[in-house]
Amino acid sequence: MKDKPALRVGIGGPVGSGKTALVEALCKALRDHYEIAVVTNDIYTREDAEFLTRNGALPADRIIGVETGGCPHTAIREDASMNLAAVGDLNQRFPELEVVFIESGGDNLSATFSPELSDLTLYVIDVCAGDKIPRKGGPGITRSDLLVINKIDLAAGVGASLEVMDRDSRRMRGDRPFIFTNLHAGEGLESVIDFIIREGMLDRKPGLAPA
C-alpha cells in the first residue's frame, strides 16, 4: 500500500493556451513511471476528456470529465465539490494512485484553484495572446506555483517578445518559477516534469531521467 495520498496538480489557464496539450504530454511522459489519473472540466461537454482518451493519453477509466455548467472557476474554487468527488472516485478505482492532474475549464486570469482541491498549481498562458499578458497580473500569473508560457515557436509570427515576457514574469512573480515551452515539440516539458517531481515530493522512478 502507498504511504501518502495522491498528489493533486491543478492546471489552469485561458481557453486555447495549451492546458490539454500539457496534460496529454505529462500523461504520456509519466504513465509508465507513476500511477496517474486525470479530471477535466468543461462547461457543457466532456470534450477535453474525450480528446485525451482518443489520443491515448491514458485508458478511459483513468479520465473523468466534469461538466461544470456556468463559470468554470466556480468548480475549482468556490464550490469544488464535483471535482473533489471525481478525485475521490479515482482514488477508489485505483488505490495505488500517485498523481491526479486536474485541468480547469478555460477561464480568465483571475481563476485559481481551491487549496482543498489542488496541492500544486500550474498556470498556462501562450504568446499568441500577446507579450503583455504577464504584466496584466491576476492570481494565475502571480500566485500559481509554476507559470508555463507556451507556444514560444509562434512568438515571431505574432510580434510577441519573449524577452519582455521574461522580464515581466520575473517582476510579477518574484521568486516563483516560470518556464517557456513549445509543447507541440516537447520543448520545456522535461523542466515542467522536474518541477512537479521536486515540488510534489514524488519519488523519481527508475528510467525517468532528470531534466
From Swiss-Prot:
The answer on whether this UniProt entry bears the keyword Manganese reads: no
Gene Ontology annotations of biological process type:
urea catabolic process
- Top-level taxonomic group: Bacteria
What's the short name of a Pfam family annotated to this entry? cobW
- Quick one: a GO cellular component term? cytoplasm
| Gene3D superfamilies reported for this sequence | P-loop containing nucleotide triphosphate hydrolases (3.40.50.300)
Q: How does it assemble?
A: Homodimer. UreD, UreF and UreG form a complex that acts as a GTP-hydrolysis-dependent molecular chaperone, activating the urease apoprotein by helping to assemble the nickel containing metallocenter of UreC. The UreE protein probably delivers the nickel.
Known function:
Facilitates the functional incorporation of the urease nickel metallocenter. This process requires GTP hydrolysis, probably effectuated by UreG.
What protein name applies here? Answer: Urease accessory protein UreG
This chain's source organism reads Alkalilimnicola ehrlichii (strain ATCC BAA-1101 / DSM 17681 / MLHE-1)
Gene name tied to this protein: ureG
